Amino acid sequence: MVTAFILINVERPRLKTIADDLLAIDGVAEVYSVAGPFDMIAVVRVKEHEQLSDLVTERIGALEGINDTETLIAFRSFSKKDLGMLWDIGVD
């Protein structure tokens, strides 16, 4: 399982529409609007790096109103809770 955080800058009037569009993409688990140098963060969980590449370059990058993205790939999860089991449910 590959987990990535996609930092996204958008045309602000389209923020809600883009959030909905992102959530409609298979592999996008969560979307947050945030303060700071980026407008949104999408949490992505896919099986393989190739899927992540396609998702970022072909699906997310093609959405109207997205100005820029930066992708962070998680190496390891540290949590008080066992999130691995939760994230693995229904993802084949």
What is the meaning of each model-derived region?
Residues 1-92:
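A compositional/biophysical signature of low hydrophobicity enriched in polar/charged and small residues
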